[in-house]
């Protein structure tokens, strides 16, 4: 019996989702432009999608269209070569892992956009096979990048000078983050501690992969880009600080994080900070090495 290569959340209509995939290249709005992977958002109708509990809505003609619509994100994974696809047969494709890991996170009450479906080896109208992961589009306020990397914003201002322009909405958001930075960092430290206590090791725990909602000063953290995760892992302090070290670089910010994390893990603050600083510096060195060797690596890629 052939293994099923897709799964759809029971709340959603499979036919609607398949139609989106068939027309992926021609419709939808880009969230992430084509590159290694690409993400588009699509609008679907909830009343056509829910199988139960919608009878009352159908009777009410005054319901606005916005109440019956839902935005979803569809991530299309880049095609892999034969060898990688062979290994995916055993550990699951990135699309499948994203879907299954999202469900598992929700079981742990760890926030992530609602998983809707995954499809492996889906053949589109151009007769090309790709894998897709579909999830709800999350309306968030900012990411960990704005919280932990304020120096990036200052660098952009310096480099662009008079050409530096951002919307009023973005300016208000950055001002709010600046005002509440320490509070957000401390709440994120508690979130990270809970993640580790649940035995979850998010291997891509980086600033762009944590979306944040501001609920009147209480911050909700959502994990995205989930295909590299481990569950049921016993994490000592060394592994925990290594896990979060890609999230930050500024030592003042790291000290705030370490101070708060130490309260929950019942370890000395200086010890937590020492582990964290060690891995921050190690990762910084790794990034620097990659940057200076990039031209050489690009030459070899071209030869291939």
Task: Describe every region a protein language model picked out.
Residues 104, 141-203:
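Conserved kinase catalytic-core helix
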Residues 83-88, 146-149, 233-238:
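Short acidic, glycine/proline-rich loop/turn micro-motifs
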Residues 18-142, 158-166, 197:
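Conserved ATP-binding subdomain of kinase catalytic cores across diverse folds
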């Amino acid at each position: 019996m052939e293994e099923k290569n897709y799964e759809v959340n029971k709340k959603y209509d499979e036919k609607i989702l398949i139609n989106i995939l068939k027309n992926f290249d021609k419709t939808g709005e880009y969230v992430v432009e084509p590159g290694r992977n690409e993400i588009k958002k699509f609008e679907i109708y909830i009343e056509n999608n829910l199988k139960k509990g919608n009878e009352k809505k159908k009777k009410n003609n005054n319901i606005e269209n916005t109440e019956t619509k839902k935005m979803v994100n569809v991530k299309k994974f880049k095609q892999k070569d034969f060898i990688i696809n062979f290994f995916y047969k055993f550990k699951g494709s990135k699309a499948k892992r994203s879907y299954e890991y999202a469900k598992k996170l929700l079981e742990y009450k760890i926030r992530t956009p609602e998983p809707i479906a995954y499809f492996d080896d889906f053949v589109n109208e151009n007769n090309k096979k790709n894998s897709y992961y579909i999830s709800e589009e999350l309306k968030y306020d900012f990411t960990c990048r704005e919280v932990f990397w304020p120096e990036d914003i200052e660098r952009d201002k310096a480099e662009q000078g008079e050409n530096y322009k951002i919307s009023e909405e973005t300016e208000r958001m950055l001002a709010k983050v600046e005002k509440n930075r320490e509070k957000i960092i401390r709440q994120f430290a508690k979130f990270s501690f809970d993640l580790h206590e649940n035995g979850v090791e998010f291997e891509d725990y980086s600033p762009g992969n944590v979306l944040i909602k501001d609920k009147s000063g209480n911050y909700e953290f959502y994990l995205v880009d989930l295909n590299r995760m481990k569950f049921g892992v016993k994490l000592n302090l060394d592994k925990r600080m290594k896990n979060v070290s890609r999230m930050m670089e500024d030592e003042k910010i790291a000290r705030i994080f370490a101070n708060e994390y130490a309260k929950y893990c019942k370890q000395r603050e200086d010890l937590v900070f020492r582990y964290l600083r060690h891995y921050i510096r190690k990762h910084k060195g790794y990034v620097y090495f990659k940057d200076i060797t990039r031209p050489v690596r690009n030459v070899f890629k071209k030869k291939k």
